[in-house]
Amino acid sequence: MIQVLLVIICLAVFPYQGSSIILESGNINDYEIVYPKKVAVLPTGAMNSVHPCCDPVTCEPREGEHCISGPCCRNCKFLNAGTICKKAMLDGLNDYCTGISSDCPRNRYKGKEDD
């Protein structure tokens, strides 16, 4: 059996750098499928993320921050409910932030065929 050390890079949306977790010494069977034995998280600061909202180890928002990126995320916080996140096109209906998510939900008055 071949012993391998796999490194999976957790990518933050901006700037496409994040942290790593290491899957230690997994075995590869005849079909080259990896069965890891143990997951070891790198210590805090092992990799430095240049994104101010992203914890470099967990790729999650830092303590006290709400989000990392998205149309309803600015300076690591959710935009206020009612903030326009997508301007109206042909249908004349804007999409608005909810204040509790970094996503830009579809305006509930838009039909399924509208976008």
From Swiss-Prot:
PROSITE patterns: DISINTEGRIN_1 (PS00427), DISINTEGRIN_2 (PS50214)
A Gene Ontology term for the protein's cellular component: extracellular region
Keywords: Cell adhesion impairing toxin, Disulfide bond, Secreted, Signal, Toxin
SUPFAM superfamilies named among the record's database cross-references: Blood coagulation inhibitor (disintegrin) (SSF57552)
Domain Disintegrin: 48-112
Localization, UniProt: Secreted
Positions annotated as propeptide: 21-47
Disulfide bonds: C53-C76, C67-C73, C72-C97, C85-C104
Expression (tissue specificity): Expressed by the venom gland.
Function: Potently inhibits adhesion of alpha-4/beta-1 (ITGA4/ITGB1) and alpha-9/beta-1 (ITGA9/ITGB1) integrins to VCAM1, and adhesion of alpha-5/beta-1 (ITGA5/ITGB1) integrin to fibronectin. Has a much less effect on alpha-IIb/beta-3 (ITGA2B/ITGB3) integrin. Also potently inhibits neutrophil migration across TNF-alpha-activated human umbilical endothelial cells.
Subunit structure: Heterodimer with subunit beta; disulfide-linked.
Identification of the protein by name: Disintegrin EC6 subunit alpha
Natural source organism: Echis carinatus sochureki (Saw-scaled viper)
Organism classification: Eukaryota, Metazoa, Chordata, Craniata, Vertebrata
